[in-house]
């Protein structure tokens, strides 16, 4: 039995394609959320995920698209990256994201696991956090293993007989390594992998969107290095390890316009 575990593509098609090529065939694919958001190719990445027949859960950026949908906001000239992403997605894409369950059950290395984007009520997690942070939510989990995405770094912690695993990000690493991360499970053994991809292709695609120059310059450095002073913070007790990336940060240039929405 071969099971592919993938997470946090963030509309980075070059990285997604590289991971699928590196992994080869799998009996089952499990996707842990955020297929869209802060990336240049949301349509193609969502199409590719839909074609894989994966068991999938939504991420917070996927949920942002559905929140915009509920507000019936489709701006002819999107003001930020979230609005631009929404303007690209078709009804079929949004229906697909809407259909995803918040959590699914699966086996991870032969042990029953709950699969979701991020543990409910947990802070943004970092591999250097103490056991007490993990035991707080693991003790409430319905199954002995919890497998998630969202933190964009590999985390594999066992506390009091329970295990938390965060699958590393494909499209937006934050660990100082720009390669796309994923995991592959074969006959109950897990292997975490990192694969190089054409970062400059994604950089060119991102630069063409019309983002404000100051944000774009910082974002491309982040993409090329897998590190940013705020978005990749190290763990310091008592301090947040993440500054949230919200759409308001990633503004579009007023003159940039927008390709027509897909129907």
Task: Please place each PLM-identified region on the residue numbering.
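Histidine-centered catalytic micro-motifs
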Residues: 8-9, 115-121, 146-154
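Conserved hydrophobic/aromatic beta-strand scaffold that supports enzyme active sites
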Residues: 103-105, 115, 156, 180-184
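Acidic, His/Gly-rich catalytic cores of divalent-metal-dependent hydrolytic chemistry
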Residues: 158-263
């Amino acid at each position: 039995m071969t099971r592919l575990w993938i997470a946090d593509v963030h509309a980075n098609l070059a990285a997604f394609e590289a991971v699928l090529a590196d992994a080869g065939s799998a009996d089952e694919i499990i996707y842990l959320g955020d297929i869209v958001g802060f990336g240049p190719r949301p349509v193609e990445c969502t199409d590719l995920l839909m074609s894989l027949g994966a068991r999938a859960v939504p991420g917070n950026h996927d949920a942002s698209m559905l929140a915009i949908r509920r507000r019936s906001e489709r701006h002819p000239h999107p003001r930020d990256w979230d609005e631009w992403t929404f303007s690209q997605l078709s009804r079929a894409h949004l229906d697909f994201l809407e259909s995803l369950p918040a959590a699914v059950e699966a086996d991870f290395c032969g042990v029953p696991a709950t699969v979701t984007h991020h543990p409910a009520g947990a802070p943004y997690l970092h591999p250097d956090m103490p056991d007490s942070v993990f035991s707080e939510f693991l003790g409430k989990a319905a199954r002995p293993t919890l497998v998630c995405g969202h933190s964009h770094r590999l985390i594999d912690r066992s506390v009091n007989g329970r295990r938390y695993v965060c699958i590393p990000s494909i499209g937006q690493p934050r660990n100082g390594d720009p390669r796309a991360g994923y995991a592959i499970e074969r006959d109950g053994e897990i292997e975490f992998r990192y694969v190089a991809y054409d970062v400059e292709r994604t950089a060119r695609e991102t630069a063409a969107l019309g983002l404000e120059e100051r944000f774009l310059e910082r974002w491309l450095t982040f993409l090329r290095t897998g590190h940013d002073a705020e978005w990749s913070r190290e763990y310091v007790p008592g301090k947040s390890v993440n500054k949230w990336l919200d759409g308001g940060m990633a503004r579009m240039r007023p003159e940039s316009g927008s390709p027509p929405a897909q129907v």
